Amino acid sequence: GRTSKADATRRQLLDAAIEVISERGYADTTVERIVEVAGVSKGVAYYHFSSKADIATYILVEGIGEIVDDFVAIAGKAPSAVEALTAMMDSFAATIFRNAGFGRILVSELWRRGREWSEPMRALEERLLAVLRGQIERGQREGSIRGDIDAAFEAVAVVGMVLTTTLHYIREAEQRAEEGCDCAEAFAAAERSLTVRICDYVHHANA
């Protein structure tokens, strides 16, 4: 129907924007380039989004929102803080592995000077950190995480560490693929290796 076609076009624009912004950076991205990659007209783009900033905001709100939902679900089920944090970091890394373009946008936007984030984006960022902080504090109560650690600082550090480390592993996998290795196997091996290291980090970093 008409709605499903509109949704497909919207998704097409978002995927094109992720590709272009992750390659060029936000400042050097134009709506013209996004519509060229998406294969749609400028009029169609402006029917769905009011501006380049609107497109970027939607990408980040959608992506961060999914990560927050995953974290909340994990926190509600995990029997211990260590298991919750391990699963959260693993889920976060898996999300970035599935969509490296989104990861590159997120890492640049999180720390970009003068960023203009919408209220929904600020709220999601705060919620993401709050869920992590809650599990770190839970670990302190359970005795698995040192009591002298600043939980708020640790939450920010975890996000930065997982994001940048995952992108590092993705780049290594891309280089292996460029050298002739099987692309799918290179990425699978990189993700497996990172998962093991995440588990080791959570179990031993705060001992």
Model-derived features: positions:
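Short, hydrophobic secondary-structure boundary micro-motifs
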Residues: R104-L106, D148, E178
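C-terminal peripheral helix-coil segments that are non-catalytic and often amphipathic
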Residues: S91-A94, R98, E126, A130, ...
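All-alpha amphipathic helical-bundle segments outside canonical DNA-binding/catalytic cores
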Residues: E83-T86, E119-L124, R141-V159, A189, ...
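Helix-turn-helix
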Residues: Q12, A16, V20-D54, Y58
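Short helix-capping/turn signature of helix-turn-helix
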Residues: F49, S108-R113
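Short, basic, alpha-helical segments at the C-terminal edge of helix-turn-helix-like DNA-binding modules
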Residues: V61-V68
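Hydrophobic alpha-helical connector segments
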Residues: Y58, V72-G101, A151-V158
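Short, solvent-exposed amphipathic helices
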Residues: S91, F102, E116-R127
